[in-house]
Amino acid sequence: MKLELLFQNIANSFAFHNQIAVAVSGGVDSIVLLHLMTNWAKKNKLSLPIALTVNHGLRSESQKEADFIISYAKELGAKESFILNWEKQNIKGNIQLQARKARYKLLAEWCKNNNVKCLLVAHHKDDQAETFLLRLERGSGVDGLSSMDYKSFLNGIYIFRPLLNFSRSEIERYAKLHQLRWIEDRSNYDLKYRRTLYRNLLKASDNQDVLTERICLTALHMKRAAKALMHYTRLAFDDCVNVHDFGYIEIKLSEFYQLPEEIALRLLLYSIMAIASKHYKPRYNSLIVIFNKILQKGSNVNCTLSGCKIRKYGENILIIRESSKIQEITVHLPLNGSIEWDNRFSCTIFGDQECSVTIAPLKKTQKIPEFLKNYDYCSEVYYSLPTVQKDGKMLAYPDVNYNGKNTDDDKVRFIINSTIKQNLVSLISI
């Protein structure tokens, strides 16, 4: 069958990964993907895939469906199968969007924790067209209207979409030919969801396949335009932005004002996302208000967005982490290796004493030591920095200098390395 032959060619792009996981919702598309993947692995004498399913717990039958997936995945030849449960807390707004974010977070975290570098998901051509129409309705820009990538990168995990060039009808024909079983999600027919409306709209067209193909072609044009814009955004970062060792970003206004507005807006956007370490963009309506304020050359800029402070400081715009949004973490000393803090720093603590300590931001009630003041930064930068504390007592301030002194008695040494450049690379690479 055409789909099976084409899949074998596509699979060569991720064949070098020793272990591969497949996200299985139980729908026909993910069941077909798992079936294709297990057959391909057997034929090529490679490691069988791991099946992962997320139980969102949103419907009474959720657990029963998850159990079916685990059992059927084993029958189809999966090496192992796991249920990942979503621990829901105070869900607000769009439940489908929240569930999607949680699903990707759970899948990526499991892969990362189990040293699996490759995750397959079952998006197909019809998903592409429906997503385009949904985003068009919301007024999305070039990025939002771009086609989904065959390969993307999330939290250190490669995500592949091998079925992206196949239609739902092709996938269903394959499933029926191989007598596969799958779950029909009732929400796919619920008209309260906008995606269902657009799915039905496509079905009602005179030639669904042609219309879907043309929508996907437009999305591909948008993808090319987005890549061109990203190229020039990266060049603008080289000219306009300083990423500081102490965990903040400085944008030179003299250069910023010379940029085309679209490039300048993207530069501001990705700077905020890199400091906040978020892969989801802040709301456009909130971002554009701040952007327009920055463009007013005489205006005072002092705003917050997405867990960041955006403020004018001299001839620059500073993007600083908002201290109230930073989570403290507790670690036990002596620490073996480094530890990540706030997705902005890799922290190393040198000291022989055995005890539990807290890595927490410097509070405004605590003094700023002279060696930090000598850097002559905006005061809010200091309050976004990590410190080592025990029972409320300061054990060590941060430093980027291995030969410096950042504590009164030197029993504890605390060295920080900014990871913001890595955050930026993951955001603006194409």
From Swiss-Prot:
InterPro entries on file: Rossmann-like_a/b/a_fold, TilS/TtcA_N, tRNA_Ile_lys_synt, tRNA_Ile_lys_synt_N
Taxonomic superkingdom: Bacteria
Domain notes from UniProt: The N-terminal region contains the highly conserved SGGXDS motif, predicted to be a P-loop motif involved in ATP binding.
Cellular component terms (Gene Ontology): cytoplasm
Reactions performed catalytically: cytidine(34) in tRNA(Ile2) + L-lysine + ATP = lysidine(34) in tRNA(Ile2) + AMP + diphosphate + H(+)
Subcellular location: Cytoplasm
One Pfam family here: ATP_bind_3
Gene3D superfamilies: HUPs
Species this protein is from: Wolbachia pipientis subsp. Culex pipiens (strain wPip)
Enzyme Commission (EC) number: 6.3.4.19
GO biological process terms held by the UniProt record: tRNA modification
Similarity field: Belongs to the tRNA(Ile)-lysidine synthase family.
Subcellular location, principal: cytoplasm
Keywords carried by this UniProt record: ATP-binding, Cytoplasm, Ligase, Nucleotide-binding, tRNA processing
Descriptive protein name: tRNA(Ile)-lysidine synthase
Molecular function per GO: ATP binding; tRNA(Ile)-lysidine synthase activity
